[in-house]
């Protein structure tokens, strides 16, 4: 008897080839039959009229902390994702000496906007080394599959202590780090990650440890993986355009050519008004790198990356005197004060204290430390997930009110009102150009990070609803391949990403006509009551992970069949 049969579905198998109708039989966590299945099964799913596809794979997340308290793997799980890779950009929770645990947590808060109180309340910190961290993840109950990099900043701090934040590594330091990378890869690390991004800073506003490293150190650490013929090098790139970015990319190509290891960087993105637009240079660079013999990938997402503001999380004005006083109150009392004409006048007048807008990224958290006057022509009052929203500036002109008054009115009418400020990828045709490039990977949700600032976890359902259904820029078969097989191949997950006999039974069942993300809302559901943005999806009927039904119509079944996925160098 089979464990599970998905009957009457239309299979989009991840290869990019045409769809077909068939049943899928599952036993012992594997796909064992595809066709007209007559054998009985303990469970059956009727997928008539629905698509059956491989589970989606997200290679750029920061779920390192969240996996400790969230069995379901939200929000990724609601968008058809069955496998995530964490430890990106050099940020990880291991290796870490016990005395430095809070410092590591504070760094994740500073860089990735993961609330400190959630980490302190939600992590039962049982590990010190990276292999011990993997062993902990392996034992945790989890609905999804997890793989992880060993992170450069964590490794550097572990070996060098506070010297890691200001000094080049000595030969002895590098030798110790090389051994740790080899140990991690043998234990199952997907590879080694780092960051050179100027936006990545510590709680003291100094560069994270990986940004201090000289290239000879990076050469040695990626070279350690080359000696084992295993492991991927992922790096958060130099984000400025121009000579600095080009020098970084040229050096990165040399690492790929010298070591032969796969190298990933990103996200590749486009910024409105930037000339020349660096994303085009990066795509050309990928072509040149591949032609030279490098194994090189750029990561990109399917939509704009946004700062999201809401009454229940951050607002651009939170550091201003009268706003600070009001925002310290419970939401109901905030609304009462905001409705008071005298208080409203003070809140509006406070906006004049804000610094002029500049070209620096203005994410949600930055509102509390470095307030900049919003560009109301680029701040949207979100009404639906189709992104056809009015700007605050247009509403202010229409109503004859100050933009701050308009925002207050909208929040009083709906305390869940969300405002969206695109940071990059404002040009949708530019995004399409990136998605169509043969050496980009459709990933980079950043799930688990920026939990009150951004909402990238919906990229998979956005791909299906916007780029496939609304824009018809991809066939469903093409889009599913980008979310499944292409990512499985890049991360060397050799038994996932296709609906094939013998492959792991990671599957998603969805309605191609209705699948889409829902509106984001703010929930106080993190450990310690910390808040985050939550975005679910419609149109996903079921998700199977290693043969067990993990979700039915978006609701968790309680099954926790997720596994720790190990890299190809695992002993």
Please annotate each region the language model reported.
Residues 11-23, 418-425, 429-431, 475-480, ...:
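Acidic, glycine-enriched loop/beta-strand segments at the rims
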Residues 31, 38-39, 90-91, 197-199, ...:
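Short, glycine-/Ser/Thr-/acidic-enriched flexible segments
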Residues 69-191, 227-228:
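Divalent-metal coordination cores built from histidine and acidic residues
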Residues 133-137, 143-145, 149-156, 162, ...:
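Active-site neighborhoods of metal-dependent hydrolases
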Residues 433-440, 445, 457-459, 509-555, ...:
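C-terminal cap of metal-dependent C-N hydrolases
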């Amino acid at each position: 008897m089979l464990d599970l049969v998905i009957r009457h579905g239309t299979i989009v198998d991840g290869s990019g080839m045409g769809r077909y109708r068939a049943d899928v039989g599952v036993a012992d966590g594997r796909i064992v039959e595809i066709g007209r299945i007559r054998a009985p099964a303990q469970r059956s799913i009727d997928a008539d009229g629905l698509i059956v596809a491989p589970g989606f794979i997200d290679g750029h997340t920061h779920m390192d902390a969240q996996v400790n308290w969230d069995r379901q793997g939200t929000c990724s799980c609601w968008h058809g994702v069955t496998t995530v890779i964490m430890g990106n950009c050099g940020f990880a929770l291991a290796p870490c000496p016990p005395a430095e645990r809070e410092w590591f947590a504070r760094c994740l808060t500073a860089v990735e906007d993961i609330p400190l109180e959630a980490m302190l309340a939600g992590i039962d910190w049982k590990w010190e080394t990276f292999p011990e961290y993997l062993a902990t993840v392996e034992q945790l109950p989890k609905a999804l599959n997890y793989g992880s990099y060993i992170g450069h900043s964590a490794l550097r701090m572990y070996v060098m202590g506070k010297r890691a934040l200001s000094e080049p590594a000595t030969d002895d330091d590098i030798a110790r780090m090389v051994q740790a990378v080899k140990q991690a890869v043998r234990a199952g690390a997907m590879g080694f990650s780092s960051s050179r991004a100027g936006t990545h800073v510590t709680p003291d506003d100094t560069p994270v440890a990986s940004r201090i490293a000289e290239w000879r150190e990076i050469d040695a650490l990626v070279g350690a993986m080359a000696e084992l013929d295993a492991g991927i090098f992922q790096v958060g790139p130099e984000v400025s355009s121009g000579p600095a970015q080009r020098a970084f990319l040229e050096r990165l190509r040399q690492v790929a050519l010298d070591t032969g290891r796969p190298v990933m960087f990103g996200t590749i993105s486009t910024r409105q008004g930037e000339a020349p637009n660096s994303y085009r240079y990066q795509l050309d660079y990928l072509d040149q790198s591949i032609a030279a013999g490098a194994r090189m990938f750029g990561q990109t997402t399917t939509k704009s990356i946004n700062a999201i503001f809401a009454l229940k999380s951050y607002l651009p004005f939170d550091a201003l005197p009268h706003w600070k006083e009001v925002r310290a109150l419970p939401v109901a009392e905030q609304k009462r004060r905001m409705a008071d004409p005298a208080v409203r006048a003070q809140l509006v007048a406070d906006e004049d204290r804000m610094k002029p807008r500049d070209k620096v990224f203005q994410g949600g958290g930055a509102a509390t430390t470095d307030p900049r006057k919003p560009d109301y022509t680029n701040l949207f009052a979100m009404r639906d997930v189709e992104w056809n929203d009015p700007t605050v500036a247009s509403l202010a002109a229409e109503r004859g009110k100050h933009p701050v008054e308009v925002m207050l009115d909208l929040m009083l009418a709906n305390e869940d009102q969300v405002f969206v400020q695109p940071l990059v990828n404002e040009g949708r045709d530019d995004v399409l150009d990136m998605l169509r490039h043969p050496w980009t990977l459709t990933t980079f949700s950043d799930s688990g990070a920026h939990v009150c600032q951004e909402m990238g976890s919906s990229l998979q359902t956005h791909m299906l609803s916007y780029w496939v259904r609304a824009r018809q820029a991809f066939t469903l078969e093409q889009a599913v391949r980008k979310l499944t097989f292409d990512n499985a191949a890049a991360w060397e997950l050799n038994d996932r990403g296709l609906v094939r006999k013998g492959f792991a039974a990671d599957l998603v069942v969805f309605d191609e006509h209705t699948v889409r993300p829902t509106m984001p809302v703010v929930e106080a559901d993190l450990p310690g009551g910390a808040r985050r943005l939550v975005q679910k999806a419609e149109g996903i009927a079921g998700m199977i992970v290693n043969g067990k039904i993990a979700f039915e119509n978006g609701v968790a079944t309680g099954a926790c069949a997720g596994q720790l996925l190990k890299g190809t160098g695992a002993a």
